[in-house]
Amino acid sequence: MSILRLLPVVLAVCTLTAAIPSQAAVAMAPAPFANGNSELGKPLNDKTCVDCHARRFGGDANRIYFRGERRVRTPAQLMAQVSYCNAELGTGYFPDEEEHIAAYLNKQYYRFE
């Protein structure tokens, strides 16, 4: 068999291998909300988020996290949603407080790595 006939297969394997992140690259990726503290985020969430979610979901504030049409699918979307809610409710949280809330929600419900 000619080596030229194997060339497309070799190229395909090389391309697929290059597209897969190495274990080292995955291990070096920063954790989402690395600057957030879930212990500081919980009381902020309890103070401002729970009541609004409960009103929107018939008294069950946690239902927002388990609904089928879940909006948040990535850490960036979670951070954006927390920022959006902060602006809509006018809570006045600073970006570091938003990250604390996102860290709490991630630990409690989302579990992004």
Give the location of each predicted region.
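Electrostatic cytochrome c docking/interface patches
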Residues: 22-44
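An amphipathic alpha-helix signature
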Residues: 46, 75-83, 98-102, 106
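Gly/Gly-Pro-rich "capping" loops immediately C-terminal to redox-active cysteine motifs
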Residues: 38-42, 54-87
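Bacterial N-terminal signal peptides
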Residues: 8-18
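C-terminal capping alpha-helices of c-type cytochrome domains
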Residues: 91-113
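Amphipathic alpha-helical interaction surfaces
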Residues: 51, 72, 88, 107-111
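Positively charged n-region of N-terminal signal peptides that target proteins for export
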Residues: 1-6
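The canonical Cys-X-X-Cys-His
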Residues: 41, 45-56, 101, 105
